[in-house]
A protein has these predicted regions:
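Short beta-strand immediately N-terminal to the catalytic nucleophile in serine-hydrolase-like folds
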Residues: 15-17, 42
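Gly/Ala-rich beta-loop-alpha elbow adjacent to hydrolase catalytic centers
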Residues: 17, 21, 25
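Conserved serine/cysteine hydrolase catalytic core
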Residues: 100-156, 161-164
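Catalytic histidine-centered segment of alpha/beta-hydrolase-like enzymes
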Residues: 165-181
């Protein structure tokens, strides 16, 4: 992230990260707090999580790599694992037709192999971040489920603020884009 913003010529920048991207954003805030104008973390806390994504990754890996499959067929196959059609549509944005057939743009094998590392969050203690820090949390089906998760964010970012969108889960930007946009605009104001 820092290499990219340096190449773009930004001294200070706002950083928004969802899920694993939120962990990356918190790590950037920890390593270069003076560079951030705003930090917005979406539905992930600075804690180690138990793995609940391997079944989803395995479901994605199990989808047919058949050039004859339509997007609708892939959507139907994925529906057994992901009931919400908006989330399926979001995931299917990463499923592309190539000359060799349908392929995932993300490296599912690497995700499956590295899941224990991705679920961890090894850094602890407060971050000396002068910039505003906001956690936009989903409701009970999101990753930020407990008071302990919220407290971990406030301990890491003592001047942090938490906004909860109780009617959405882990993908608030997909499940209720308008509410998410309002929370994000407020956090970046």
């Amino acid at each position: 992230v820092l290499t990219t913003v340096d190449a773009l010529g930004f001294d200070r920048f706002s950083l928004v990260g969802h899920s694993l991207g939120g962990k990356v954003a918190m790590t950037v805030a920890r390593s270069a707090p003076e560079r951030l104008a705003h930090l917005v973390v979406v539905d992930v806390a600075p804690v180690a999580y138990t793995d609940r994504y391997t079944p989803l990754v395995e479901s994605l890996r199990a989808l047919p790599d058949d050039a004859g499959c339509s997007r609708a067929e892939i959507d139907r196959a994925l529906a057994a694992q992901v009931a919400d059609p908006n989330i399926r549509a979001f995931l299917l944005q990463n499923y592309r037709r190539t000359d060799a057939g349908w392929r995932w743009r993300m490296n599912l094998e690497a995700l499956a192999e590295q899941m224990p590392v991705l679920m961890d969050y090894p850094a602890h203690g407060p971050v000396t971040l002068a910039a505003p820090a906001t956690l936009i949390a989903g409701g009970p089906t999101g990753l930020v489920r407990s008071d302990a998760d919220r407290q971990a964010f406030l301990e890491a970012f003592p001047h942090g603020h938490i906004v909860t969108l109780p009617h959405v889960g882990h993908w608030p930007h997909v499940e209720d884009p308008a509410a998410f946009r309002a929370a994000l605009v407020s956090a970046l104001a």
